[in-house]
Amino acid sequence: VKPPFDISGDLDTPVSAFMKLAAFEPRFLLESVEGGERLARYSFIGFGDGLEVKLDRNGLAIGRERRAIPANSFELLQALRDALKLAPQPLPDIPGVPLAGGLVGYSSYDVVRFFERLPTRIQSNTPALHYIAPRSLLVFDHLTRGIALV
């Protein structure tokens, strides 16, 4: 078994590696900063044909399956449970790797509308919810200047 951070990070930054992986969709880059100004220890790039979950004004997409917009909070939570069953499973704990998979993304404030009665809002082109469960993950360790492919 190779050690987790066995790729040299001297020639690539997380941003340059993210750009090189443009052909792999969906993908994401998580950069971390401590105290608003100092680069934290790890950066993550998720990519590959894992699973994408997106809720927008056209409905809810879980992978290639398209559903109607959930009618209530129960339907939304059930759809997210369904998505978790379909997503690639995170690897068991790998020493030195703080993130090894799972759903990464966001739920906008508008998702609150499934749980609370709020005034109607003008529809946006931005998804109300967008998560990606990547097939592969590059983990940059800024302290050791190593990269792990998980």
Tell where the protein language model's regions lie, with residue ranges.
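Signature of the chorismate-utilizing enzyme
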Residues: 1-150
